[in-house]
Every structure is written in structure tokens, then in C-alpha cells.
Amino acid sequence: MPSTLAVFLVLGLGLSQRSSTQKQMLSKPAIWVRPSFMIPKGRSATIGCRGAGEAMEYQLHFEGGLSALKRPKSSPVMNWVKFPIPAMTSHTAGQYRCSYRSGELWSELSDPLELVVTGLYDTPTLSVEPRSEVTSGENVTFHCQLATATSTFFLLKKGRSSRPQLRYGNLRAEFHLGPVTPAHGGTYRCFGSYNNHAWSFPSKPVKLLVKVPGDAGDTTFAPTEHTSSDYWDSYELTTGTQSQKDHLLWNHMIQNLIRLGLAVLVLVALMGFLLEDWLHRRKSQERAHRASRRGCRRRLRAQRALET
């Protein structure tokens, strides 16, 4: 009986210590990304992680594995760190979490942060039925189509709080909205997806206007959304600027190739001239050598004839 009591005491002590350790675990940090969770291929982004209390060290986890370590600056006001992503690719897109350490204790992992790389492969087309201007209470359908082989599509409305809608289809998908209200008004784009974190270029924008009938006639409501010039505007600016840069780079590359080709032609021609001159000199030297040998033989024969 005493031995059994001792076993229960040991088990109880262990459970108590484990419970105490769990209670001492730090609260999970906050994680975010700038400028947006959708990042065009090649563009940079920054992941932020903020812990509570005196955080001494931060860890960034990518797809379940440890990605980076960082210590915050010695400032009590900015108790957070930044993890930069220099250039977004399909290899850096995915799910991120972060954690922090204070003393000997580590926090829980943060909520997941899903980063998506866009600008891969082709561009889908987006249309709306029955029309882009409708009356409140009607039903509308967005059609997103992509020629390449994909069965996953996302529809996204411009706005800070907008979340993408997911649909599946064979090269195309339908997004049904309705009955619509003025809150549905706004600018929409769609994407084709090759996996959850690799999206196509965005479609051209389609603007939906929702009218509300009133006593004084129909009133068209502008989109009641708090838009920001983060992803949407900067994407158009960046892709336009990038296309100009690509065009200039391509022209510069073509010019360099032309110059290189001309230089090669000049070098080949020069080598041809040098080779021809070398062959001409060699033939002249061989003819002179043969003539000299023939002259020597004639002199030897004449000398022998005189001796005899």
C-alpha cells in the first residue's frame, strides 16, 4: 500500500508540473505581411511578427519547418521583428507561422499566414452576367476562364477586407452572387490557380454597379469599401513598369546580341585574312626553298662534270 501511494504521488507531481508548464507557455504572437498576401512574382514582401512582453528571440516557420531566427532591436517600443522576402517565387509562397521566446519559455505558434505568388503562366478572362449594372435584389454571375489546364479559380473584390472566393471548374468557373446589395458593388478580378499558393496573372478588372430604386429615381451607389493602394494599384503600376523594364531589357539584349554577332563576323573575317596571308607566305617560302635546292643540285652536277 505505501508503494502504491508513492506511485500516485509521483504521477500527481508529474501531472502538476506538466500543467504548470503549459500554463506558463506564452501567448501566441501576431503575424502579418506587407504589402499584401498576394505578391507578384519577383516582388519583395515583408513578414512581421509581434510578441507580448520582453521577447528575446523570434522564429519564423515555413510549411512546418524552421525558416529563420531573429532578435529584436533593444527598443521597448518596437517589440517586433521583420522577416524580409527579397523576391517572391513559387518556392517562397506557402504557409507561415511565427513564435517568440522570453527567458526560457517559448510561445505558441501564431495563426497561419498564407502567402500567394501571382503572375504565373497565363491571364484569365472575367465577365459578368446579365450585365455590369444591375438593380439591388438581382442575381449576377461572374465567369472566369483560363485556357491552360487548371480547375481552381479565385474571385477577389477590391478592398482591404476582401477575401477570395474559391470555385472549381474545367477551364472555367462560375461565381454566383445574389440577391445583390450596394455592398456587392466594386471592382472584381479573377485568378486561375495551379496550387493553393501559385496563381496566374490577374484578369482585367470588371466593375459591378448596383442601383437602388428610390422615389427620386434610381441612384447608383459607388462601392462602399475602404480601398487601399496596396496590391491592386501597385500591381498595375508594377506590372506596367516591369513590362517596360522587360521591354527595355529585351531591346538591350537584342542590341548586345547584334553587336556580338558583328564582332564575331569581323573576327572570323580577320582570321580568314590572316590564314590566307599565312598560307600565301608558306607557299612562297616552299617555292623559294625548292628553287634553292634545285640550284644547289645544278651547281653540284656542274662541279662534278668539270672534275671529270
UniProtKB/Swiss-Prot annotation:
SMART domains per the record? IG
Tissue expression as described in the entry:
Selectively expressed by NK cells.
The organism's superkingdom is given as Eukaryota
Q: Which UniProt keywords apply?
A: Cell membrane, Disulfide bond, Glycoprotein, Immunoglobulin domain, Membrane, Receptor, Repeat, Signal, Transmembrane, Transmembrane helix
Disulfide bond positions: 49-98, 144-190
From which residue to which does the signal peptide run?
1-21
The record's comment on protein family reads:
Belongs to the natural cytotoxicity receptor (NCR) family.
Q: Where are the transmembrane segments?
A: 260-280
Its membrane topology is listed as:
Single-pass type I membrane protein
Ig-like domain segment(s)? 34-118, 124-207
Q: Identify this protein by name.
A: Natural cytotoxicity triggering receptor 1
The record places the following residue ranges in the Extracellular compartment, namely 22-259
| Species for this entry | Bos taurus
Asked if the keyword Chloroplast belongs to this entry, the reply reads no
